[in-house]
């Protein structure tokens, strides 16, 4: 029964639904704003999922650059890591875990070669020295500092938690 006391039949209901669904096609607009990041004059388009994350200033260390996402994650740190062509990270292990998604380029270490789209999970049982012949951009998530295992870089270990 409708608001005027009239009986609504099944046919009336079907006609009503048909009337609602028989509209012109709607044109959907993409509202995704593309975001990019630049390291040493090389610009990378970020995946859409990262577009809304606030990115801090870039810190440059030789052929390495890092920009931290400002996510207030306590002990978890999320970064973009750029390795320039011919660059690498000194030999190290991890005090906690490190998750890496390779966003662009490639790198290799003692475990193998990694290319765009690869997902790598490492912890304190892994020692490696990532190097990139042609450069790469990585999305990394870690819960503690690196622990350098060779050379002068070992001098950074006592202050590692302040710089990771």
Model-derived features with residue positions:
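Glycine- and acidic-residue-biased ligand/ion/polar-headgroup-sensing regions
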Residues: 84-87, 94-109
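Ligand-binding loop in jelly-roll beta-barrel domains
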Residues: 126-148
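Short, loop-centered acidic/histidine patches that primarily coordinate divalent metals
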Residues: 104-105, 119, 123-125, 141-144
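Positively biased amphipathic helices and basic secretion/translocation or surface-docking motifs
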Residues: 1-54
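A short glycine-rich, His/Asp/Glu-containing loop-to-beta-strand
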Residues: 54-87
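Short acidic-glycine-tyrosine-enriched beta hairpin
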Residues: 109-132
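Short histidine-centered beta-strand/loop micro-motifs
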Residues: 70, 80-81, 90-94, 111, ...
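Alpha-helical membrane-targeting segments
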Residues: 52-53, 58-59, 147-164
């Amino acid at each position: 029964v409708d608001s005027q006391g009239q009986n609504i039949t099944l046919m009336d209901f079907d006609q009503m639904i048909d009337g609602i669904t028989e509209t012109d096609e709607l044109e959907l607009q993409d509202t995704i704003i593309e975001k990019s990041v630049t390291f040493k004059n090389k610009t990378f388009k970020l995946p859409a999922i990262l577009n809304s994350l606030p990115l801090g200033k870039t810190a440059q260390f030789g052929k390495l650059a890092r920009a931290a996402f400002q996510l207030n994650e306590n002990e978890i740190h999320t970064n973009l890591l750029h390795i320039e062509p011919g660059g690498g990270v000194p030999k190290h292990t991890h005090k906690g875990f490190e998750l890496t998604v390779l966003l662009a380029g490639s790198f290799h270490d003692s475990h193998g070669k990694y290319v765009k789209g690869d997902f790598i999970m490492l912890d304190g049982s892994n020692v490696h020295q990532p190097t990139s012949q042609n450069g790469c951009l990585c999305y990394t998530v870690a819960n503690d500092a690196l622990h350098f295992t060779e050379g002068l870089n070992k001098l950074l270990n006592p202050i590692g938690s302040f710089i990771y």
